[in-house]
Amino acid sequence: MASESVSSIRYGVTSQRTRIVLELSEKLDYNLFTLDAPHRVVLDLPAVTWPEQKPDDPSNGLIKNVRYGLFGPGKSRLVVDATGPVEVQKIFMLGPSAGFPYRLVIDLVETTQASFLARIAKRKASTPNKGVANAVPQVPFTPKPKTKKAKRVIVIDAGHGGVDPGAHGRKALEKNIVLAFAKALASTLKRTGKYEVHLTRDRDIYIPLRKRVNIARQYDADLFVSIHADSISRSAVRGMSIYTLSETASDKEAAALARKENRSDIIAGIDFGDQPAEVANILIDLAQRETKNLSVKFAGIVVNEMKGKTRLLDRTHRFAGFRVLKAPDVPSVLIELGFLTNKYDERELSSSKWRNKVAEALSQAINQYFVTAALDN
């Protein structure tokens, strides 16, 4: 655990500015920058512990929402969603005085969109290599001959994490629910002795979507399972669903979910200008067709195995353009365990008994998938 900490975050709003004050355990280095589409102010700090209770966002002023968490090894991040284009008028550190600890003070004022974009462009021009350093490169695609492995490789992806909490229940946060389930599933699979299992994250940290895909490809995974929990305005809706990749969504709800999940990098303050374009070629297209077919096959097995084990959403298998499912050579699915906005689902998803039962059922589905894959070959 980090020894440095942010003990509190508070706000001050006047007609001229909105002030953010972070109380710190000690003087810390920091880096602050702005991002567009949507308008965000991003503050990077060394790894710190944050207040357990998130302060209420100001009801007026220039801030819509603030979130924070571990962004990467040795780095924490605070992301401010602004109501529109803003300028950081001042940022300064105050030393301990009058009973207060170190304080980092950030003053935001309104500005024009043109001025906002000009400041972003100026920052990027002054640090030309920073984007390259922060970019997540794609793992080059080369068709691989099918080789028999001692153990099948499975990568389990706990969605969201760190600065991105995901869906909110009355008490539970998606990032915590899915990490607990991912660990339970990994333990269940390892106990079979049949699989080499890897987690994209094993703690409360944010992993960019492209990097999650890269992890699966770097391990030469035979299966990628991304674990999530959903939320919706209609609190009566509940049940598990499973998604596979398609550029055309199966329905409006699946399309909306994909848009929401694909915003994860935006929520975490990722600069898309730093990211290389996705590569397209005929070899990738051919490989992805086979991969999609295998993904659909696995999804069907999961649906059948889960019947009677947990509540299922109507039309349980759906499809849409999820960025995290885009490995061209790794069969991939995204499983929404249930809805944190439903009190019954939230209670089940928070239960170790339910978690272990469903992890066991998913393990059985994985066993069946690889048995049928071996027979097909």
Model-predicted segments: where are they?
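Catalytic-core regions of hydrolytic enzymes
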Residues: 128-279, 288-304, 308, 347, ...
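Short beta-strand elements
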Residues: 89, 313-319
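Short, solvent-exposed loop/turn elements at domain surfaces
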Residues: 31-32, 52-53, 163-167, 343
